[in-house]
Amino acid sequence: MKILVVGAGGREHAIIKKLKENPEVTEIFACPGNGGIAKDAECVNISATDLDGITDFAVKMNIDFCVVAPDDPLVLGLVDILESKGIPCFGPSKKAAIIEGSKVFSKNLMKKYGIPTAGYEVFSDPEEVLSYIKEKNEYPTVIKADGLALGKGVIIAESEEQAEDAVKTIMEDKKFGDSGNNVVIEEFLTGPEVSVLSFTDGKTVVPMVSSMDHKRALDGDKGLNTGGMGTVAPNPYYTAEIAKECAEKIFLPTVKAMNNENRTFKGCLYFGLMLTPKGPKVIEYNCRFGDPETQVVLPLLKTDLLTIMRAVHDETLSFLNVEFKDESAACVVIASGGYPLSYGKGYEIDFGDSENTENVTVFHAGTAEKDGKIVTSGGRVLGVTATGKDLNAALSTAYKATEQIKFKDAFYRKDIGARALAALKK
């Protein structure tokens, strides 16, 4: 089988490595891929948002199955175009991808179908937003751009001044373009956060092992929000009891709601949850695998990934028994100095002996190949994942490998998994 994976990050690298385990897979192509993916697949220099370019390539190469991993091409409708050419895909249609593509849509969906989430209001006029925030006078308050914003469109304002700045940034300065035409103002929830990725064929929902993300750039959850600086799995706060409650009140109701709206969702549906004192609530939906959550979840998957993806496409997921290893995984992201703001590129990476460490996989994100060497090309450069019998073992191995990797201005958080370990001690 010839497989095409669309995307260029650590998530795509993790997907490709897992797909390679299936003996039926003869060739894997990545559009556009990166320096590390090039060792596991043939990289083709076509941007993930060049829908025509990808479609032409897929048709020309007689691709048997395509995995569309990032949010942008999903929201733009790449799956619909490829399917119309007879190429089966893993990923939601354009109509279904709106669950991530518009926060206004997803909040209204939850309200209509009684899915637990934070209280909210929607605005399209900056003046109205500001007078609403002033009148409520409740801080912190959460301000979200409606559309896609590379994971950076959510601002938590601690004061009226910060709220004004956020509204100006999103709605007037148009930092995220048309994504900021509308904003959602949400109540601030408290409690541990949990990421749950799930496979769904629009009928059955199979939650994957839970994970815990670390969004802030610096140790102690300080610094700016990022796309994610590391993850651990499973998430110790997510007990069997809570999982059952989420399945009944959130996961299945969401999939049924999408069916009712004639937007059947097939693919990976990501639930960003907060375990509040009043029970689990949805903070966000994503229409695809999370990054770097995928880098800890897929290494723990026992069942063949391609088999699952084909079952999702064929709507036969209920016939599969999807299993995960009874182990833990940890991923430490190594980033370029200055990330998530401006950073240098093109620095050569010295991997030391990291890639030969037992139970470790180094997933490439912002890397490129230059003159036979691997160099930095993005903000989040590598994700170092380790598995182990428990979280302590996984973290210790991941950090042992991380310490061996060197490039100019590299930095990583030293406290990935600290909250999870503290929760386990309780």
Region roles according to the model:
Residues 90-153:
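A conserved helix-loop-beta module that forms one wall/lid of the active-site cleft
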Residues 247-269, 286-359:
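Active-site "cap" helix and flanking loop/linker of ATP-utilizing ligase/carboxylase catalytic domains
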Residues 153-294:
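Internal nucleotide-binding/catalytic subdomain
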